[in-house]
Structure formats: structure tokens, C-alpha cells
Amino acid sequence: MLKRSLLFLTVLLLLFSFSSITNEVSASSSFDKGKYKKGDDASYFEPTGPYLMVNVTGVDGKGNELLSPHYVEFPIKPGTTLTKEKIEYYVEWALDATAYKEFRVVELDPSAKIEVTYYDKNKKKEETKSFPITEKGFVVPDLSEHIKNPGFNLITKVIIEKK
């Protein structure tokens, strides 16, 4: 009787331990790995292909710092147009990542621009391109022959106010 009880408990424990492994495997396989590249840390995935990195500081109309959210990366596609309206939308998402629905974008710094730095294989030197932020916008260039993951950086101050 004791042998049967021990055998039953052993089988039961093995059954539960394998079910937890199966659940972890199925949960991890549901993540779409094609859109992201694994970085150094197992919990960090960066977008593959071009991306817009938004790193802003939220200030009031007098220049006093109100919010300094972490940077946020958004996948973008070559050939798409980034207008001022779209960029403000991305900035608001970055603000929401720190203080959800608390602030709205009033205005981007007039000197704000988006920059991308890459090694130009034709010129054989590092190249930096700047794109002004306008209502008309700019077309995201295809830099795939020079770099796999071009990061278009927006690093600026943004005038914000409470909603």
C-alpha cells in the first residue's frame, strides 16, 4: 500500500512539473520574434529595421522641467512620411509611458530635428543626416545597404501641459 501511494505521488508530481514547463514554452512561443532583435539582456528586444527613438524632456511654457520619461523606440518603415503631427503623436506615447494620460504635447522645440547616424559604405565614412520637423514632413530614407537597424533619433525639449 505504501509503495502504491509513493508511486502515485511521484507520478502526480511529475505530471504537474511537466505541465508548468509546457505552459512556459507555449507562452514564449506566442511572442512574435520576427519583429524584434534580442539584445544583451534576455528581457530586452529592440525593433528590427528602422526605428524612431523618442527621447524627450517635458517642460512648461517657462522652461521648467515637468517630466523626463525614458526613451521609447517605435518601428518605422522606409518610404513613409513622418509629419509633425505623427511625431507629436509618438512623443505623446512616450509621455504616456511614464505618466499615462496626464500630459499633452503643446509644442515641440522649434529647433527640434530627427537625426540618423550610420557608416556610409560608398563614402567610407560615418554620416549624419538631419531632418527638420515640419507640417509637410520628410520621407524616411532606405538605409538598408548601409545599416541593418538605423535609429532615427528625436532628442529635444517639448512644451507640455497637464490634461
Curated annotation (Swiss-Prot):
Entry GO terms, CC: extracellular region
Gene3D superfamilies, sorted: 3.10.20.130
Coarse class of the protein's main subcellular location: secreted
Keyword Secreted in annotation: yes
SUPFAM superfamilies for this protein: Staphylokinase/streptokinase (SSF54328)
Keyword field: Plasminogen activation, Secreted, Signal
InterPro entries, per the entry: SAK, SAK/SK_sf
Signal peptide: 1-27
UniProt subcellular location: Secreted
KW Signal (keyword) present: yes
Task of the protein: Potent plasminogen activator that converts plasminogen into plasmin. It forms a 1:1 complex with plasmin, which in turn activates other plasminogen molecules.
Family recorded in the similarity comment: Belongs to the staphylokinase family.
Protein name: Staphylokinase
Native source organism of the sequence: Staphylococcus phage phi13
